Amino acid sequence: MEFGLSWLFLVAILKGVQCEVQLVESGGGLVQPGGSLRLSCAASGFTFSSYAMSWVRQAPGKGLEWVSAISGSGGSTYYADSVKGRFTISRDNSKNTLYLQMNSLRAEDTAVYYCAK
């Protein structure tokens, strides 16, 4: 009986790991004002194409600020006024990856950027 319980517990742990949602951002760096950066967010653990995705950011000492969002198909995009015309959100559903192209960067764009489901 002990063995059986251990086996069930192990299966439960493995199932939990398999279903875990992971969002891993990359692409940040130092850039001068007026420069460009492209952020990427690799997603796993869910059906990526079924969900709208967003980018949010947190400037030093400030709260979270929504930056941009994109529909599951990629057909609709939305932007905060502060980044409109400078940032472009996109996604590649075949790669389960979300992108944020940031151009004409300003000092006030300095922040930690997060992707969100």
From Swiss-Prot:
UniProt organism field: Homo sapiens (Human)
Residues covered by region (Complementarity-determining-1): 45-52
Q: What is the name of this protein?
A: Immunoglobulin heavy variable 3-23
In this chain the Ig-like domain maps to: 20-117
The signal peptide annotation in the UniProt record is 1-19
- Record-level GO cellular component terms: blood microparticle; extracellular exosome; extracellular region; extracellular space; immunoglobulin complex; plasma membrane
Any one GO molecular-function label of the UniProt entry: antigen binding
Q: Which Pfam families match?
A: V-set
Which stretches does the entry tag as region Framework-1? 20-44
Q: Which SMART domains match?
A: IGv
Q: What is the effect of changing residue 80 to G?
A: In IMGT allele IGHV3-23*02
Region (Complementarity-determining-3) residue spans: 116-117
Q: Enumerate the UniProt keywords alphabetically.
A: Adaptive immunity, Cell membrane, Disulfide bond, Immunity, Immunoglobulin, Immunoglobulin domain, Membrane, Secreted, Signal
How does the annotation summarize its subunit structure? Immunoglobulins are composed of two identical heavy chains and two identical light chains; disulfide-linked.
Disulfide bridge map = 41-115
Compartments annotated for it: namely: Secreted; Cell membrane
State the residue spans of region: Framework-2: 53-69
According to its UniProt entry, the function of this protein is described as: V region of the variable domain of immunoglobulin heavy chains that participates in the antigen recognition. Immunoglobulins, also known as antibodies, are membrane-bound or secreted glycoproteins produced by B lymphocytes. In the recognition phase of humoral immunity, the membrane-bound immunoglobulins serve as receptors which, upon binding of a specific antigen, trigger the clonal expansion and differentiation of B lymphocytes into immunoglobulins-secreting plasma cells.
Q: Would the keyword Cell membrane be found if you checked this record's keyword annotation?
A: yes
